[in-house]
């Protein structure tokens, strides 16, 4: 079995080594081919390992870093001041081919800027995009992009997002994914010039299985496998859907934990529903891919817990196995060749 090495920014996210270190240890038991390099304050990481009753090994190593890029730091400043930071060092390991992928829960803007600067974009890609899987009512997944890397886009960028998202989804689905553009209506006359132009380009591309427009209330209804939008719209939709899921889960949990007769009834009636709703928990879908780069970079939620970071590491393993950047490059080359002729 070929090993897969992932560089984990141990200082990234709201909780740092308190969750990243236990997550790395758990991930090693989940993925036998995985090796993890923990990048961060060595004393803090070692302390967490001691509390877990474990230590470094051939599969778990530490690379000490002096600095952490804060969540409030502007991307331009992060680029200038990133030397010896845990995030920069994680990306450098991918660039130097000492790691196959990196995972960070740190500053999204800084991660995108550093990844683009260090790893460079694939040929034909103008901007990277954040993509993540979302649950649907059928139990399947849908992939949505962009989720915040680009707050404004032109039609060419949206088209490239569709190509990249289609390539990623196909590696999970093993079939041509259905691609839709998020819009305010399903009719062709609806929407602004941006989405209309993107839809026109997609409808003329045989290599993309374009199924038309999709409205916001259909995102989780399994009518498309890939949903394309700009980063502003995508981020708002993502946060709204996560908040709604958490609301239902917390409300139901509160009712079921009540010690009154109402709580007993709720436990009897809704225990199965509660288990179903737990599949909507955003932590189960943690690990947004930064697509369009010459290397694999996975963005974890800043507030991610241990299980969520394990999922992000799992996404990194999957993308390395499936060689996602080269798949995207091949797909883009085929699409551009088709459009040229």
From Swiss-Prot:
Query: What subcellular locations does the record give?
Result: Cytoplasm
Keywords from UniProt, A to Z, are: Cytoplasm, Lipid biosynthesis, Lipid metabolism, Phospholipid biosynthesis, Phospholipid metabolism, Transferase
**Gene Ontology CC annotations of this record:** cytoplasm
Question: What Enzyme Commission number does this protein have?
Answer: 2.3.1.274
Q: Name one GO molecular function term.
A: phosphate:acyl-[acyl carrier protein] acyltransferase activity
GO BP, one example? phospholipid biosynthetic process
What does the similarity note say? Belongs to the PlsX family.
Name of the protein described by the UniProt record? Phosphate acyltransferase
Which organism encodes this protein?
Answer: Vibrio parahaemolyticus serotype O3:K6 (strain RIMD 2210633)
Organism placement in taxonomy: Bacteria, Pseudomonadati, Pseudomonadota, Gammaproteobacteria, Vibrionales
């Amino acid at each position: 079995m070929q090993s897969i090495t992932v560089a984990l920014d141990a200082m990234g996210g709201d909780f740092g080594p308190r969750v990243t270190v236990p997550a790395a240890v758990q991930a090693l038991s989940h993925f036998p081919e995985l090796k993890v390099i923990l990048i961060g304050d060595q004393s803090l990481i070692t302390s967490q390992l001691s509390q877990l009753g474990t230590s470094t090994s051939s599969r778990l190593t530490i690379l000490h870093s002096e600095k952490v890029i804060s969540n409030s730091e502007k991307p331009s400043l992060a680029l200038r001041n990133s030397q010896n930071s845990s995030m920069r060092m994680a990306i450098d390991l991918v660039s130097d081919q000492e790691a196959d992928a990196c995972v960070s829960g740190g500053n999204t803007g800084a991660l995108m800027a550093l990844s683009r600067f260090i790893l460079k974009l694939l040929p034909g890609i103008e901007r990277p995009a954040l993509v993540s899987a979302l649950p649907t009512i059928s139990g399947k997944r849908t992939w949505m992009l962009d989720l915040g890397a680009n707050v404004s886009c032109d039609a060419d960028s949206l088209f490239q997002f569709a190509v990249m998202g289609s390539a990623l989804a196909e590696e999970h689905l093993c079939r041509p994914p259905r691609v839709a553009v998020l819009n305010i209506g399903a009719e062709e006359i609806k929407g602004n010039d941006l989405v209309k132009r993107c839809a026109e380009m997609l409808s003329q591309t045989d290599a993309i299985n374009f199924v038309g427009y999709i409205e916001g209330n259909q995102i989780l209804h399994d009518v498309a496998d890939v949903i394309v939008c700009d980063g502003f719209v995508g981020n708002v939709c993502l946060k709204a859907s996560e908040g709604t899921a958490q609301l239902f889960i917390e409300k139901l949990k509160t009712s079921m934990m009540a010690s009154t007769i109402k709580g007993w009834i709720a436990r009897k009636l809704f225990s199965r529903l509660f288990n179903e709703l737990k599949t909507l928990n955003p932590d189960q879908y943690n690990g947004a891919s930064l697509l369009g780069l010459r290397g694999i970079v996975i963005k974890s939620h800043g507030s991610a817990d241990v299980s969520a970071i394990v999922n992000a590491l799992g996404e990194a393993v999957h993308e390395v196995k499936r060689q996602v950047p080269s798949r995207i490059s091949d797909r883009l080359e085929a699409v551009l060749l088709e459009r040229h002729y």
